[in-house]
Amino acid sequence: MILRKYRTEDCESIAGLFYETVHSVNAADYTPEQLNVWATGKVDLEAWDKSFREHFTIVAEETKEEKQDFGKRLLGFGDIDSTGYLDRLYVHKDHQRQGIASAICDELERAVPAEKITTHASITAKPFFLKRGYRVVLEQQVERGGLLLINYVMEKVVK
C-alpha cells in the first residue's frame, strides 16, 4: 500500500468506494433507509473535488505487487481541513481492519497545525476513533432526507 496526495482523477473512484463502504460496512449500525440517504450514489463530483483540493486529502492505493487486476485499486481515503476538522475517512469494504484507516489518519493528524482534531463519527467508526484517543463530545441526531442518523462529535488534542 502507498499513501499519496489526492488527485482530481481520483474523485470518481472515491465516490464509488464511499457508496460501497457505507452500504456494506455501516449496514450493521444503520437501516437500509438511513444508508440510502447517507450515500445516495449521486455525488456532486465537482463539489467533492473542490473540497478534496481545498483540504489535505490522502488516498491509499495498492502497490504494483498487491494489485489483482489492471490498474491500481483505491483502498481508502481521508481528508482534513486547516482547522483540524477531519471530514471523511473511508476504507474499501474488502480491506477493513488492515491498518489502512490508521495510516491515513496518522497522516491527516500530522498535516494540520491545529491543536485539536474534531470529527463527526458514525456509530460504526466511533470505536476506531476512541482507540486513537478521541473522546465523545456530543451524541447527535443528524437529519438526512427526512431521516435521523446518529453520529458523534469527537475530538482529540494533538499538540
Locate each region found by the language model:
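Conserved acetyl-CoA binding element of GNAT-fold acetyltransferases
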Residues: 81-94, 152
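A short beta-loop-alpha structural element at the N-terminal edge
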Residues: 2-16
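Conserved acetyl-CoA-binding loop-helix of GNAT-fold acetyltransferases
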Residues: 91-93, 97-110
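Short hydrophobic/aromatic beta-strand element in the GNAT-like acyltransferase core
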Residues: 55-59, 77, 88, 118, ...
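Conserved acetyl-CoA-binding loop of GNAT-fold acetyltransferases
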Residues: 132-140
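Conserved GNAT-fold acetyl-CoA-binding loop/helix
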Residues: 19-46
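Conserved beta-hairpin
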Residues: 55-76, 81
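C-terminal "cap" of GNAT-fold acetyltransferases
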Residues: 115, 120-125, 139-159
